[in-house]
Amino acid sequence: MAVAMSMDANCPKNIFLLCRNTGIGFDDLRLHCIFCTKQLTTTELQAFALRELNVVWRRGAPYGACARCLLVEGIARRLKYWEYSYYVSGVEEETKQSIDTQQIRCYMCHKPLVKEEKDRHRNEKRRLHKISGHWRGSCQYCWSRCTVRIPR
């Protein structure tokens, strides 16, 4: 079911609030990708919700992002807006707070990192990256995807 809201309405920023405010069930919700305009599949909609990504509003209509465009945009943003990289201790020194209390997302899929993923960066001495003014790392899934060795 398509959704539209007036420009002065308080537009919900996440999928669950969008469903609640419009009375549309999650399974009936239809969003298009803000980048390529294709309709998100049910799986992409679920992933969008689980990654806690914000709904984007254009001309009174809500948009999400498909899996392919999220990956492409993540790579493009990293290449275009990378500022510098630090180990966990450097990030904590710069921000004056533990990474455990900071919102750090995966630079590939944009999922918020959980404590175990942040701990892995610390324990395995992997760098976090400052991209577009925000600290980014790798989630468990993207970490393994980026470290796969190609057999010779």
Swiss-Prot record:
GO CC terms, sorted: host cell cytoplasm; host cell nucleus
Principal localisation: host cell
UniProt organism field: Human papillomavirus 3
Assembly and interaction partners: Forms homodimers. Interacts with ubiquitin-protein ligase UBE3A/E6-AP; this interaction stimulates UBE3A ubiquitin activity. Interacts with host TP53 and EP300; this interaction inhibits TP53 activity.
Protein name: Protein E6
GO molecular function: DNA binding; zinc ion binding
Keywords linked to the UniProt accession: Activator, DNA-binding, Early protein, Host cytoplasm, Host nucleus, Host-virus interaction, Inhibition of host innate immune response by virus, Metal-binding, Modulation of host cell apoptosis by virus, Transcription, Transcription regulation, Viral immunoevasion, Zinc, Zinc-finger
Taxonomic classification: Viruses, Monodnaviria, Shotokuvirae, Cossaviricota, Papovaviricetes
Gene of this entry: E6
HAMAP family attached to this UniProt entry: HPV_E6 (MF_04006)
Protein family according to the UniProt entry: Belongs to the papillomaviridae E6 protein family.
